[in-house]
Amino acid sequence: MNVNSSAFERTNRFPSFPVLKDDQKTSSDSIAAAKKKDLLSLISSKSLLSSETLGWFSVICAFSITGSGLEVNTMSIPFYLIFGIFAFVSFTTQYLGIYSFSFQPFQLLNVIIASLSMVFITLGAFVLGTLDTTCLLLLAFKLFFIRNDPTPFNARSANLKNYIAFPICLFVINHILILLGYFQCSYSVFYASVFYILLGVFIRVFYLVNKEKFEKKELAFLFSSIVVACLIQFNVLPLGTINLSVTRFTILCFMQIFCINWDGIARIQFYLGKFDISLIMALISAIINKTASQNSIKIISCLYQVGFCFFKIGSSITANLKLPDNSRIYRLYNDFIVNGVLADKESRSIFYFFLLNVSYMFVQVIYGLWTNSLGLISDAIHMAFDCIAILVGLVATTLAKMPLNYAYPFGFAKIEALSGFTNGIFLVLISFSIVGEALYRLFHPPQMNTDQLLLVSFLGLVVNLVGILAFNHGHNHDHGSHHHHSHSNHSMCLPNTTNDINIFEEFEEEKDNVEAQKMGYTNDDHVSQHEHTHENSQEHHHEHNHNHDHIHKYNEKCDHESISLQNLDNDHHCHHHHENHNMHGIFLHIIADTMGSVGVIVSTILIQWFSWTGFDPLASLIIAALIFVSVLPLIKDSAKNLLSVTDPESEYLLKQCLSNISLSNSVISLSNPKFWTNERGEVYGILHIQVSIDGDLNVVRNEVFRKLSIAVPNLKHICIQSERPNNCWCGK
């Protein structure tokens, strides 16, 4: 009784920790899993990273960044340069199908339309504030979509009053500020900005409607817009050149990628109360943004305007964020990050280094904006390209691990070679650009400020050294050549099977099992025999026999004959060039950055000692030469891999072996020999043989397989199809 009472007291004292039985634990685990699934679905369905919401938010941020005073040093950007950059962005995004849902077909006319629209709105947003630009956008959209209404203002007065009243208030405020001299802008520039924004919106929405009905109007309106663009370019109209910082203009260009998709703007319902405190604060922020002299106050007012536009004006979008494409974001994150990058130790280390690189890049950007240092911002932009290269390598690593399928029976391993080749070409272009800039600076030495170079270069060197350590001391297990010699009286087994080959074997066996379940007995009407011989660490071959004179049960166990190569004598030399071109390319990027940091440190010290700025271009020339020399082997090897080239040694052995096989009495001819070497030095091949009537198909095929296995020790996979004369499906 005492034991039971004490147990009762314990269970009452700690009621939240009951002792569960096995079935209760299983039920509890299932409930926890269900709750976790519901939470993940909630996160994925309520994600802010949907195409519509992200596009709307990017539009607002683009306007804010355009008109904010984040940097003092600016550069003059002409109209043609703005149009050229936006044309490139529009062409790339529409050609690749990125955030271009409003343009169904890819046409050059659509690229021009999107480019003109983005240029006009950028010019207008450069002068006006975030609220002004956003409200004019919404007003233009609404006026366009009710243009065919017989009584638009009577029928839709309740909806239009906010769209019209708020821009009128901002218009009056801007006029008063210009009159008082607080808003440093002329009336002509102000009116031109309003006109540009309206024109950009009308160009954009004209091509959202039925093209058959408004085809002539579209062409006429487009021609008028091109005329306006030409007048701006030749400074007949204002804002032919705008003064923007490099950072703001670069961020603006990236923002415009998401700004292409504006379908959600047409569905925004703008409801504001007469005495809404947020409305009053928005008008005050517009006044502060025009009159404040300190950048910090302007930034605070811009942030409030972004929040007001996104959550108040765009409330009809933010109130319903459950869009169908949100689940794909979580699925992409789970497949790429969790099951792809983080599942492998090597790629996980590179991913952590990528996060460190991105973090350091943002630190450089923030500190560069804070101190107005062009050197820090330039180095951050350079590091951004390195982050892109590392990200491409990580994507290639994940895609290369995708399972085989019927469409890609040899897998996706060549993606790594393609990534390595791309990174190699990119490094060659970088080395050429460094040489050109260094030669110019060598003969035209600029004035250099070396106060912050040592600190920035030292921090960059530390980050790159961490990246080298992430590769396990230079990625020594993947780079370099590994030589294996096999002579007589030595074991002659093939290398261990890689994951790709295991997957392929399982893929073939699974296909056979599916066919076995579908078919019980077969009775073929023709004489044909098709064998596939697969060689892996277990050295087995797989046969499929179809003969008209017997019945073969598919549910019987298939015959797997093991061919042991342990006691075979061979005096050939086997060479394996074991290299991952993708990781090699990433590693060379880190090495190039490391050499750059070291070069900057050494040149900075020499400049401070001898006061000659020529040490900087000399160090750049040495670094460019080292990058060029180190990247050539990567380009050469990855190009051979992409072209499916057989290495010279294996090619010589294959020619000798195939020549000996062709002399056999049972072999009439050999056709379609295709052999190639992958990046691990393993040989793959396909071969058709025609066997005489006197020869046995199985015996001849096994003999061919045995001879090839002995002659080419690094033969990994060979598919041999043995046929009777004049009975091959390929016509040989």
From Swiss-Prot:
Query: What cellular-component terms does GO give this entry?
Result: cytoplasmic vesicle; endoplasmic reticulum membrane; Golgi apparatus; Golgi membrane
Instruction: State the compartments where it is located.
Output: Endoplasmic reticulum membrane; Golgi apparatus, cis-Golgi network membrane
Q: What is the effect of changing residue 375 to E?
A: In cis4-1; confers sensitivities to the calcineurin inhibitor FK506 and to a high concentration of MgCl2
Q: Name one GO biological process term.
A: zinc ion import into Golgi lumen
**Pfam families attached to this UniProt entry:** Cation_efflux
What kind of membrane protein is this, topologically? Multi-pass membrane protein
Tell me which InterPro entries the record gives. Cation_efflux, Cation_efflux_TMD_sf, Msc2-like
Which keywords label this protein? Endoplasmic reticulum, Golgi apparatus, Ion transport, Membrane, Transmembrane, Transmembrane helix, Transport, Zinc, Zinc transport
Primary location: endoplasmic reticulum
Membrane-spanning parts: 52-72, 79-99, 111-131, 163-183, 189-209, 219-239, 240-260, 268-288, 350-370, 380-400, 415-435, 453-473, 586-606, 615-635
The UniProt GO MF terms for this protein read: zinc ion transmembrane transporter activity
Quick one: effect of changing residue 393 to D? In cis4-2; confers sensitivities to the calcineurin inhibitor FK506 and to a high concentration of MgCl2
Q: Does the keyword Acetylation apply?
A: no
Q: What is this protein's function per UniProt?
A: Probable zinc transporter involved in Golgi membrane trafficking through the regulation of zinc homeostasis.
PANTHER family with a match to the protein in the record:
PTHR45755, ZINC TRANSPORTER 7
**What is said about its interaction partners and assembly?**
Interacts with zrg17.
Stated name of the protein: Probable zinc transporter cis4
Q: State the gene name recorded for this protein.
A: cis4
